[in-house]
């Protein structure tokens, strides 16, 4: 019989967007679901995704403003309604979308009387403004306002260092997070050991990314963080490779009939290879060869597997051991 830790599911894990709306240019909302999950998995994924969405996605902000003849941040300028501090706070709120790496320069140069908005910022071609109507200042007199700006792409929240004002250059607190908020909730259904979960994920962004784009990027970042653990499997001691064990010829396809005969109740196409607890390197090799289920695996011969890129005879031996463990079949001693 199949051991209890292999849970046969007739459903494939699926996600979809169930709600999407734009409340304003700088506030987008998306609601997503992922199901069916086993008990406990929804909370694991929800917590990880929330952290990745809030902390791992990069954004672009104005991090410094420079203008001549301004003595300090709290001074006022004749002919401008706002104080320097208020102008800096308005610049902080400007939402940018870019493919920027590191920092770059931008500027504002206008003559009053008139209102100054985000549309007046002169940007490099690879940076764009999400909402051109965002207010910066009001010029009440026929004066010139020229401000040099520094743009930076980063992640998280950077607080300006105290006493970091020099030559009319003022640092600005930067909120690089395109995702403004994330909520996750869990709906459980079923009974006893068959209980399953649905994960609901709500995402609010500032408009520089859509919630769906943010979800993709956070997922990629999570995968990148875990890849070193997968590579560790490939860095095993070289001495292990010096003791190769020859295996008796065995064809998975030849065993398929016997497994089906003895295990009629096993839905082979619904047992996925990730349920077999294979090492990450073997698992990745199989997935890259479009082997996703136990049925896919058993439809390949030993020779087919060894021909796969980066696949070794030791890996085939380990698959033998895994199938023996889960199906209580001594594959190596059966021809």
UniProtKB/Swiss-Prot annotation:
The keyword Protein biosynthesis does not apply. GO terms for cellular component: chloroplast; DNA-directed RNA polymerase complex; mitochondrion. It is found in: Plastid, Chloroplast. Signal peptide: none annotated. DNA-dependent RNA polymerase catalyzes the transcription of DNA into RNA using the four ribonucleoside triphosphates as substrates. The N-terminal domain is essential for RNAP assembly and basal transcription, whereas the C-terminal domain is involved in interaction with transcriptional regulators and with upstream promoter elements. This is DNA-directed RNA polymerase subunit alpha. It comes from Spinacia oleracea.
